C-alpha cells in the first residue's frame, strides 16, 4: 500500500483523485477515511470485481440522516436527475465506497476537470457495474462535520460539473426578464 500526504485539505474529490493518480493496482478501493463504512466489506467488493464487474459500489441498506440532510439529499438527486437527463444513474444510498477496475481509473484520471463529482462520473462512464448491500454501523464517536453550507456548495459544484443546463436556464431567465 501507499500513503499519500497532501499539504492541505483540497476537498474530498481532489483527495480521491490524488489517490487514483498514484495507484498502480488492477483494481482500486475508494473509501472515506472516517471508516464509517466497514473495511470488512472490502473482501466482498473484491469478490464481485473478480466476477467481472468494472465497478462494484457499496449500497447502504438503511440511511440514518438528520431530517435536514435527508431533505437536501432528496432535493439534490431530484434536481440532478432533471438536469442531467440521460447518462447518469447514481444508485440511491451509495456513497464513494467502491472498487473500480484499472480501466475506470485510467478514464477518470484522464478527465482533468477542476470540479468533479466522481459518483456522477463513474456512473456516466458506464461499463459493467453492480452494487452490494450492507448495514452501515452507527457512528461510535464524534459527529459529522458536514455543514449545510458545505452540502449546498458540494451539491451545486457537483451539478454544475456534470451539466451546463442550470447555467443555460439562469441565462435564459436573465435574458427574458
Kindly give the residue locations of the regions a language model identified.
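Acceptor/aglycone-binding surface of glycosyltransferases and processive sugar-polymer synthases
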Residues: 6-8, 12-22, 39-118, 137-156
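Histidine/lysine/aspartate-rich catalytic loop segments that bind and position anionic ligands
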Residues: 127-129, 135-138
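Short aromatic/hydrophobic "clamp" motif used to bind/position activated sugar donors
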Residues: 28
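Acidic donor-binding segment of Leloir-type glycosyltransferases
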Residues: 1-4
Amino acid at each position: 500500500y501507499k500513503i499519500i500526504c497532501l499539504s492541505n485539505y483540497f476537498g474530498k474529490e481532489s483527495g480521491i483523485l490524488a489517490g487514483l493518480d498514484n495507484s498502480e493496482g488492477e483494481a482500486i478501493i475508494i473509501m472515506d477515511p472516517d471508516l464509517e463504512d466497514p473495511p470488512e466489506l472490502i473482501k466482498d467488493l473484491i469478490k464481485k470485481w473478480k466476477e467481472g464487474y468494472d465497478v462494484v459500489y457499496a449500497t447502504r441498506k438503511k440511511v440514518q440522516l438528520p431530517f435536514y440532510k435527508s431533505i437536501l439529499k432528496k432535493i439534490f438527486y431530484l434536481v440532478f436527475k432533471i438536469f442531467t437527463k440521460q447518462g447518469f444513474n447514481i444508485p440511491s444510498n451509495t456513497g464513494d465506497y467502491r472498487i473500480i477496475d484499472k480501466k475506470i481509473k485510467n478514464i477518470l484520471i484522464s478527465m482533468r476537470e477542476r470540479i468533479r463529482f466522481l459518483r456522477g462520473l463513474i456512473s456516466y462512464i458506464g461499463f459493467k457495474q453492480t452494487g452490494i448491500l450492507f448495514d452501515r454501523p452507527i457512528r461510535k464517536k464524534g459527529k459529522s462535520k458536514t455543514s449545510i453550507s458545505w452540502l449546498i456548495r458540494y451539491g451545486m459544484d457537483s451539478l454544475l460539473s456534470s451539466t451546463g443546463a442550470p447555467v443555460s436556464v439562469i441565462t435564459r431567465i436573465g435574458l427574458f426578464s
